[in-house]
């Protein structure tokens, strides 16, 4: 019985890992950001865009501690680094 449970847990963990890899982990986990981060400012430096759209030129997805409303993510002005 313990072997079956261990196999099932490995399968579930593998499925979650593959799902994260397929999504590219480009978008942050909003629950983590809301707990530990700060809200996106919606200014010229950073603003929210719909989840399945791209950041405009000269902007990129913000670091992981920025969050927006549900189904949106934060774009920040590209720093050039």
Swiss-Prot record:
GO terms for molecular function: toxin activity. Its main location: secreted. Contains 4 disulfide bonds. GO terms for cellular component: extracellular region; nematocyst. Transmembrane segments: none annotated. The keyword Ribonucleoprotein does not apply. Induces neurotoxic symptoms on zebrafish. Has also been claimed to be implied in calcification, but tests on homolog proteins suggest that proteins of this family have a neurotoxic function and not a calcification function. Belongs to the Cnidaria small cysteine-rich protein (SCRiP) family. beta subfamily. This is Small cysteine-rich protein 6.
């Amino acid at each position: 019985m313990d072997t079956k449970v261990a196999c099932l847990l490995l399968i579930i963990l593998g499925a979650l890992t593959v799902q994260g890899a397929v999504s590219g982990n480009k978008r942050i986990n909003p629950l983590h950001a809301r707990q530990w981060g700060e809200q996106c400012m919606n200014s010229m430096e950073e603003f929210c865009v719909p989840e399945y759209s791209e950041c405009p030129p000269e902007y990129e997805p913000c670091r992981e501690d920025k969050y927006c409303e549900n189904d949106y993510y934060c774009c920040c002005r590209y720093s050039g680094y």
